[in-house]
Design a protein with these regions (language model features):
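A short, N-terminal "cap"/entry segment at the start of jelly-roll beta-barrel domains
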Residues: 1-23, 27
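Conserved short histidine dyad/triad with adjacent acidic residue
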Residues: 12, 25-42
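A generic "binding-loop/recognition-motif" signal
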Residues: 24, 33, 43, 63, ...
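Short beta-strand His + acidic residue motifs that chelate non-heme Fe in jelly-roll/DSBH
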Residues: 37-39, 57-58, 75, 80-86
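Glycine- and acidic-residue-biased ligand/ion/polar-headgroup-sensing regions
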Residues: 44-56
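Short acidic-glycine-tyrosine-enriched beta hairpin
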Residues: 61-78
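A short hydrophobic beta-strand segment most commonly corresponding to one strand
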Residues: 88-95
Length: 95
């Protein structure tokens, strides 16, 4: 199995549940080049890992991180954030 195969190429941003348990979950996210996961918040701390591609994570506190394959960023709860696909990107969000 491959994370990339979970997503359709036609959606600019795609989020598919990868794993769920009573204690947390993982979501596979694909962002196509030039597209953006729009501004939103999370109620729980999260970890965003870049599997493939290049994306930029930003939040309302001025944090800006370029994510390449293997890079990750922690996401604070109740802080607006967004992610832009500089290249087609495969990411995993763990909460």
């Amino acid at each position: 199995m491959n994370i990339k195969e979970l997503h359709s190429q036609v959606k600019p941003v795609s989020a598919i549940s990868l794993f769920k348990s009573e204690l947390g979950n993982a979501t596979a996210i694909q962002i196509l080049q030039g597209e953006k996961l729009k501004e939103h918040i999370t109620k729980t701390p999260a970890l965003l890992i870049c599997i493939e591609g290049k994306a930029v994570f930003e939040n309302e506190n001025g944090i800006k991180a370029t994510l390449l394959s293997g890079d990750y960023v922690t996401i604070e709860p109740m802080v607006k954030h967004w992610v832009e696909g500089i290249q087609e990107s495969q990411l995993v969000l763990i909460k």
